[in-house]
């Protein structure tokens, strides 16, 4: 598995299939806005989701691109397989594995700076879309920070929750606080696989 970070790569066939299954699952949900990272893999997911089932909201009828929802910049690790990063940069990989707050992958983004970026954009979205239902398309690292924001799990703590690709997560913002209503829901993907079984 490669460290993608902010490398701007398109979805593969599996990713496109997953995006269509997300769209199927969201039939009947009315969104007031669709906000996406501007990285191609998130934007393609947004486009496939809204075009497939017509969930594009009124009045704008557009996806709002938000660069602040980009994945973390993994600097010198980007494009490498995890095993390659560990072999080429053993001390740096240890800092990564230990979730060192200020480790920035050379020219990348530290965990503390990344978390501050995610907190800022989520606060802005909550304020801008108060009382509305918003479809947000982003990346695993961003979701890691969002989950920790909502649950109080410290940034340095090992991850004890899943972040599967194309899962649906439902969060709510009320009284200046995020809460998780449903996390890592993959029923739409499992159901689709069952349909393919002999």
Which ranges hold each PLM region?
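Loop-to-helix element that buttresses phosphate recognition and phosphoryl-transfer chemistry
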Residues: 1-48, 52, 104-119
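Short, basic/glycine-rich phosphate-binding loops at helix/coil junctions
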Residues: 2, 92-105
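Phosphate-coordination/substrate-recognition cap region in phosphate-metabolizing enzymes
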Residues: 21-93
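Active-site catalytic microenvironments for nucleophilic, acid-base chemistry
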Residues: 25, 48-52, 124, 128, ...
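Short coil/turn segments at beta-strand junctions that form active-site/ligand-binding loops
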Residues: 30-32, 130-134
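Alpha-helix capping/helix-boundary segments
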Residues: 41, 142-143
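Acidic, low-complexity terminal tails and accessory targeting/binding regions
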Residues: 74-84, 127-132, 148-198
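Short basic (Lys/Arg) and small-residue
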Residues: 139
């Amino acid at each position: 598995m490669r460290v993608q970070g902010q490398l701007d790569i398109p979805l593969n066939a599996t990713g496109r299939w997953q995006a269509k299954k997300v769209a199927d699952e969201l039939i009947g949900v009315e969104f007031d806005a669709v906000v996406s990272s501007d990285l191609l893999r998130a934007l393609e997911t947004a486009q496939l989701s809204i075009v497939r089932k017509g969930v594009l909201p009124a009045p704008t009828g557009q996806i709002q691109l938000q660069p602040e929802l980009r994945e973390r910049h993994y600097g010198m690790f980007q494009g490498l397989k995890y095993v390659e990063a560990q072999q080429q940069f053993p001390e740096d990989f240890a800092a990564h594995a230990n979730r060192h707050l200020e480790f920035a992958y050379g020219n990348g983004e530290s965990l503390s700076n990344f978390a501050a970026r995610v907190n800022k954009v989520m606060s802005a979205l909550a304020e801008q879309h108060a009382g509305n239902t918003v479809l947000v398309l982003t990346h695993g690292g961003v979701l890691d920070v969002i989950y920790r924001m909502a649950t109080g799990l410290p940034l340095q703590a090992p991850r004890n929750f899943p972040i599967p690709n194309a899962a649906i997560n439902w969060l709510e913002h009320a009284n200046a606080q995020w809460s998780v209503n449903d996390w890592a829901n993959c029923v739409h993907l499992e159901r689709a696989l069952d349909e393919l079984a002999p």
